Amino acid sequence: MLTVDVVALTGGSVPNLLLVQRAHPPFAGEWALPGGFVDEGERVADAAARELAEETGLKLASLCLLGVYDTPGRDPRGWTVSITYLAPLPAEAPVIGGDDAREARWCPADTLPKLAFDHATIIGDALVRWAEGPDRGRSPPPQGDR
């Protein structure tokens, strides 16, 4: 299964991260990054933007590739690969839980709740990228026909 996750963050040395409370199993009621399954025929970056909008109401035109997470057992539903994006923002935007999310909220990176899946690992990687400097995760746009 192919999924996407989005690490949206804003702030200074201790950024705030956008999390959603899951409405459905697995991990119903637990906090996670916005994300979900890629639809057949859908571009991965488009799926990330769609899931972010569906679950939080936040619409972004630009996302930066963070990494690929494929550790066996990361999802109890079966073998799943997540292509993960970083979305550095200049300020917190209003968000609202929707679709598969009961709630969406900004949380300080130093006081995160228990997270579903391997999202603590993903967030750790995102925070390293965030701390790297002024470009904070900016990457060149993807190549290919669009």
Labelled PLM ranges:
Residues V38-W130:
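Unchanged
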Residues G133-R146:
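Polybasic "coupling" helices that flank or enter modular domains
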Residues M1-A32, A45, L60:
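N-terminal strand-loop-strand
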